[in-house]
């Protein structure tokens, strides 16, 4: 699935200077492309408020990032849990009306989550970097900044806001982009979870030989439907490679019940990223216990 970058000039001038119409190539072809295109605008707006240089200065006084990989590897719960804080999504709208990031973070840590993922995209997921900052103050767990990262600026902003790890999505980044952004994260001692959706993307990532956390997203980017077959089919082919290269495979999305969890555990999945299953329930603790302790 090809995700194009936003055209530099999304309109075509018509007759007088004050008239313009959208160019046909300036229309996003799917929701993921729309999100990525909006990131260009969002990043420019962020830079007007805080420069990259100012972010770098702030990082100098921060404590070292927490070890995301180690927390999943040494988790008492198997597979390790990356519990997500997410208010809304493009496909479901508002998922959790009673949304208190501080209370959710404290709850997750008390239940034994290995790490916490925080949505920071505002327009499509109603997240923010302010939420990430709130969660940082509320828990000692490693935090993943869950965003659609296309720029080094976002990585520095995530670090300043309290993130220990970032998400890179193979579908929206070239190999050169992936290598460059990974180097930025490495320089900041941050962990990187790289996300794939199919075998072509996974092959790309393995050839780069740069990542030890690979997330297999079970969500179809065209339909936004989830199917655990994505994780199962890829693990059937690549489990041995992951093991030999000390790569932790993480299954993301569509994990709804204890049976799903057992299926993933049995094929060698080392971590699971779960958000909506917890967010849609009024009692997160009950939902968590039902998922991990009912077998």
UniProtKB/Swiss-Prot annotation:
<keyword id="KW-0456">Lyase</keyword>
<keyword id="KW-0057">Aromatic amino acid biosynthesis</keyword>
<dbReference type="InterPro" id="IPR045186">
    <property type="entry name" value="Indole-3-glycerol_P_synth"/>
</dbReference>
<keyword id="KW-0028">Amino-acid biosynthesis</keyword>
<dbReference type="GO" id="GO:0004425">
    <property type="term" value="F:indole-3-glycerol-phosphate synthase activity"/>
</dbReference>
<dbReference type="InterPro" id="IPR001468">
    <property type="entry name" value="Indole-3-GlycerolPSynthase_CS"/>
</dbReference>
<comment type="similarity">
    <text>Belongs to the TrpC family.</text>
</comment>
<dbReference type="GO" id="GO:0004640">
    <property type="term" value="F:phosphoribosylanthranilate isomerase activity"/>
</dbReference>
<comment type="pathway">
    <text>Amino-acid biosynthesis; L-tryptophan biosynthesis; L-tryptophan from chorismate: step 4/5.</text>
</comment>
<dbReference type="InterPro" id="IPR013798">
    <property type="entry name" value="Indole-3-glycerol_P_synth_dom"/>
</dbReference>
<protein>
    <recommendedName>
        <fullName>Indole-3-glycerol phosphate synthase</fullName>
        <ecNumber>4.1.1.48</ecNumber>
    </recommendedName>
</protein>
<dbReference type="InterPro" id="IPR011060">
    <property type="entry name" value="RibuloseP-bd_barrel"/>
</dbReference>
<dbReference type="GO" id="GO:0000162">
    <property type="term" value="P:L-tryptophan biosynthetic process"/>
</dbReference>
<keyword id="KW-0822">Tryptophan biosynthesis</keyword>
<keyword id="KW-0210">Decarboxylase</keyword>
<dbReference type="Pfam" id="PF00218">
    <property type="entry name" value="IGPS"/>
</dbReference>
<dbReference type="InterPro" id="IPR013785">
    <property type="entry name" value="Aldolase_TIM"/>
</dbReference>
């Amino acid at each position: 699935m090809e995700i194009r970058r936003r055209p530099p000039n999304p309109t075509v001038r018509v007759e007088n200077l004050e008239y313009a119409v959208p160019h046909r190539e300036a229309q996003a072809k799917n929701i993921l492309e729309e999100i990525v295109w909006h990131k260009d605008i969002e990043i420019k707006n962020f830079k007007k408020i805080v420069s990259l240089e100012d972010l770098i200065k702030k990082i100098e006084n921060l404590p070292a990032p927490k070890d995301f990989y180690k927390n999943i590897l040494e988790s008492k719960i198997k597979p390790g849990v990356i519990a997500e804080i997410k208010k809304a999504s493009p496909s479901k709208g508002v998922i959790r009306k009673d949304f208190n990031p501080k209370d959710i973070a404290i709850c997750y840590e008390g239940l034994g989550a290995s790490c916490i993922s925080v949505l920071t995209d505002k327009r499509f997921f109603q997240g923010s970097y302010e939420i990430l900052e709130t969660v940082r103050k509320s828990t000692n767990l490693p935090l993943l900044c869950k965003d659609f990262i296309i720029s080094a600026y976002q990585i520095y902003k995530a670090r300043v806001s309290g993130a220990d790890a970032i998400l890179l999505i193979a579908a929206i980044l070239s190999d050169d982009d992936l290598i460059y952004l990974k180097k930025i994260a490495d320089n900041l001692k941050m962990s990187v979870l790289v996300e794939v959706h199919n075998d072509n993307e996974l092959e790309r990532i393995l050839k780069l030989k740069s990542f030890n956390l690979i997330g297999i997203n079970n969500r179809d980017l065209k339909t936004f439907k989830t199917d655990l077959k994505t994780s199962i089919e890829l693990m059937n082919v690549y489990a041995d490679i992951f093991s030999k290269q000390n790569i932790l495979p993480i299954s993301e999305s569509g994990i709804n019940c204890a049976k799903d969890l057992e299926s993933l555990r049995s094929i060698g999945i080392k971590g699971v990223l779960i958000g909506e299953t917890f967010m849609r329930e009024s009692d997160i603790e009950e939902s968590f216990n039902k998922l991990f302790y009912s077998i």
